[in-house]
Regions:
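ATP-binding N-terminal substructure of ATP-dependent carboxylate-amine bond-forming enzymes
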Residues: 1-130, 162-166, 336-340, 392-396, ...
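Peripheral (often C-terminal) accessory segments that flank ATP-dependent C-N-forming ligase machineries
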Residues: 14, 147, 331-435
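Active-site "cap" helix and flanking loop/linker of ATP-utilizing ligase/carboxylase catalytic domains
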Residues: 26-27, 269-289, 296, 306-368
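Local beta-strand N-terminus motif with an aromatic residue
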Residues: 35, 101, 183-184, 240
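Glycine-rich phosphate-binding loop signature in dinucleotide/nucleotide-binding domains
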Residues: 95-101, 174-182, 214
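A conserved helix-loop-beta module that forms one wall/lid of the active-site cleft
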Residues: 120-206
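Internal nucleotide-binding/catalytic subdomain
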Residues: 192, 199-300
Length: 435
């Protein structure tokens, strides 16, 4: 893929130049032509920097708006609209195959099925596209898990409000609720959105009316009481190479890695569940990000699984804690030319290899009207405070939070005590960052 000389770049394009990019500084790692050629599907500057510091050739496939940045920073780039689905969708797979690309790595949720479709062509394995659909459609995902003997809660699909009403009543009838007893909550989720997007907890029948018609169809699930956590597992040749347990402090707010000793005590049982997941979904390689619940009596329930980097900058947290690039790890296990020895040598020992505990907190304004960003002293004066990505508000009125909502930015922490980290992250919920 040809790189545009600086002399041919316009001032507008050059305004996008990042002097810290290895490709600009001249420090990019030489590429080994005997190793795989990676296509990164989607957009992540951190993933691009990781690719530049890795020994694999790479190319970025992202929307047209990324073109000037890529040109300015000497990044090999193919523009592609991932929202466009038509009879020309095969073009990108054909073009990447002609380019000599070996594998496509998805960087966000909307590129997972694209990676499946492209890899089915690059690797001549049609089943890979069907597998990617299982990772994108949460109803199909749950059914596949059930077929594999994985424990899940009660779930159904909702196409209209009345479906949710019936489901909520049926779940509570199953739980032998009597008249006057408070209902157990249920959850509704978008079929194909990442993380907390479109995720609502419904506690009363009246709350169902708050769901806009355009959000249907939805997946409905019974509420699982227990300890919710996430896993990031890198898989090569059908086997787990590295398994991180991410501990949620409050869902949608905070997470840290590695987990506390209490949650890590479940590692053997969690590993068995991940091995069952790999077998059930026939996963040969890649990075998976499943979520589970552990109940008080030790039962483990499957929530969902994603085939792309997690939200809340979990890859960056893992790199901070362990020292290896999680993006490079994904490129390594996706690459069909990687050897077992190379993969084994890349990863440190789980938990023991960590240099400390890395966590982050997603900030939501607690006030209806705000005028400025003001970092609380309780946050920035704490010895565990690392950095933040918050910016000044662009408007004074805070929009209503939809479902679990989308945070306004992340605050990062690093320290040597997981209990202090957990308590610190929890305490951030009582602070005002926007005033």
């Amino acid at each position: 893929m040809a790189i545009t000389p600086e002399s041919e770049m316009s001032p507008e394009v050059l305004s996008w130049r990042d002097p810290e990019m290895p490709s600009v500084k001249g420090t990019e790692k030489p590429k080994d032509p005997s190793k795989g050629y990676i296509a990164l599907l989607g957009w992540s500057v951190n993933a691009i920097k990781a690719a530049q510091n890795f020994d694999r050739r790479y190319i970025v496939v992202a929307p047209e708006w990324a073109a000037d940045f890529c040109t300015a920073n000497n990044i090999p780039f193919i523009p592609w609209d991932f929202l466009r689905l038509n009879d020309k969708s095969m073009e990108i797979a054909t073009r990447l195959k002609e380019e000599g690309v070996d594998v496509a790595v998805p960087l966000f949720e909307e590129t997972v099925e694209w990676s499946g479709a492209i890899n089915s062509v690059l690797m001549d394995s049609p089943r890979m596209f069907g597998q990617s659909i299982l990772f994108r459609d949460k109803a199909l995902m749950k059914r596949r898990a059930q077929l594999g003997g994985i424990r899940v809660g009660i779930f159904e699909e909702a196409h209209e409000k009345e479906d949710i009403v019936r489901f909520m009543k049926r779940v509570n009838q199953t739980l032998l609720k009597l008249d006057g007893d408070p209902d157990d909550p249920i959850h509704v989720k978008a079929f194909d959105k990442a993380g907390c997007l479109g995720h609502r907890m419904i506690r009363t029948l009246d709350e169902i009316d708050q769901i806009p018609d355009e959000e249907y169809p939805l997946l409905m699930e019974s509420h699982l009481s227990g300890w919710e956590f996430a896993v990031e597992a890198w898989i090569h040749d059908g086997k787990i190479q590295f398994l991180n347990i991410s501990e949620y402090v409050t869902l949608g707010y905070s997470v840290f890695v590695p987990a506390t000793r209490e949650l890590e005590s479940w590692r053997e049982a969690i590993t068995k569940q991940i091995e069952l997941l790999i077998k059930t979904f026939d996963i040969k390689f890649g990075l998976i990000h499943p979520e589970y619940f552990v109940t008080a009596d030790g039962e483990m329930y499957f929530g969902e699984v994603a085939y792309r980097p997690p939200g809340f900058k979990a890859f960056e947290l893992i790199e901070k804690a362990y020292g290896f690039s999680a993006y490079q790890a994904s490129m390594l296990v996706f690459d069909p030319k990687s050897t077992k020895e190379e993969v084994a040598a890349f990863f440190p020992k789980e938990v023991e290899g960590a240099k400390g505990y890395a966590g982050c907190f997603g900030v939501y304004p607690r006030r209806r009207v705000v005028s400025k960003l003001e970092m609380p002293k309780e946050c920035i004066d704490h010895p565990y405070f690392d950095y933040h990505e918050l910016v000044a508000p662009t408007e004074e009125t805070v929009p209503d939070r939809n479902a679990f909502g989308t945070h306004w930015g992340l605050v990062f922490f690093f320290g040597d005590d997981p209990i202090k980290m957990r308590d610190l992250l929890k305490s951030q919920e009582d602070l005002d960052f926007y005033v």
